[in-house]
Structure formats: C-alpha cells, structure tokens
Amino acid sequence: VDGEKIETKTVIIATGASHRHLGLKSEDELEKKGVTYCATCDGALPMFRNQPLVVVGGGDSACEEATYLTRFASVVYLIHRRDSLRASKIMADRVLANPKIKPIWDSTVTDVLDVAQNKVTAVRLKNLKTGAESELPCAGLFIAIGHVPNTEVFRGQIDMDEDGYVK
C-alpha cells in the first residue's frame, strides 16, 4: 500500500462475477433498451408490460426469470439450445406447466433487432438441429446464461480453473 510491502498469510479475493453475454454486437447496442440481464430489476418496466418477452437459458436462473416475467408479459418465450431444461426438476416442471411460458428448444439467438429503431423489436433464432432461421417478435430479451468471474486481473498469478474461478 503506497509503496509499502505488506505480508499476510491470507488474501481474500472478492471481485464478484458479471453476467455472461451472448456475444452479439446488437446485444451490446441494445443493452438497457430492451436487452437486460435481470428480470426482477427490469421486468416491471412499462416497456415490457403486456408484451411478448424472451428469456435465454435453461437453468434454474432462466426458469426463475421466465416465471417472474409472467406477471407482466403477455407471453414469455424460453429459448434453450438443448431439447430439455438443465434446471432442477421442480423448476423445470413449474415452467413447463405454466401456460404463459412457451419453450423453444434446440435454438439460439443469433441477432437482436432492431438497432435502427434503438429498441428491441424481435430476436433472430437459429434451430441447431435443422439450421432453420426465424424471427420472433418481442419487446425484451432477458439473458440468463450464467456468470463470468471477475478474475482476469489475477490470471497467471493465482490458481484458477479453466472458467476463471479461483481454486
């Protein structure tokens, strides 16, 4: 600290984690304009009320987000790259029994529309089994595909697993 060397037996690294992104340019351009990573933070906003919404993911977090959004949305599409949810059985059963949640299996979001309008109007989907592409109209995209640890600054200095989590 201020040029002084401090010796210690333990260092606590509490840098947290950031939301994992899809990696799309349009996702970044439309963040906070319909692209979000937190249903409880943003789901009740007027721009999402009584509108079709999309959640991406297949784990417990995605299922929780989709279930929460049914309070506000006209319909919630749950996009998952596999043919079944990775969520716990109780969460998966709850989602699959909810008439306002429509799963779309074996698919990924390849683009978010419409950057020109400066708001989310649809997502472009690709079916991973057939290769077919389609557009799904929506007012919001809620991304729930996990987190990335904020540990890059320590790479090469401490032991981490392949995902960047401290061992």
Feature roles, as predicted:
Residues 62:
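N-terminal Rossmann-fold NAD(P) dinucleotide-binding loop
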Residues 66-67:
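Generic hydrophobic/aromatic pocket-lining and core-packing "Φ" positions
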Residues 6, 13, 70-167:
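A Rossmann-like FAD-binding core segment of flavoenzymes
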Residues 6-33:
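Glycine/serine-rich phosphate-binding loop and adjoining beta1-alpha1 elements at the start
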Residues 23, 28-47, 145-167:
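FAD-site-proximal beta/loop scaffold in flavoenzymes
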Residues 49-51, 106:
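Phosphate-coordination loops involved in phosphoryl transfer and adenosine-cofactor binding
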Residues 57-59:
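Glycine-rich Rossmann-fold phosphate-binding loop(s) that bind the pyrophosphate
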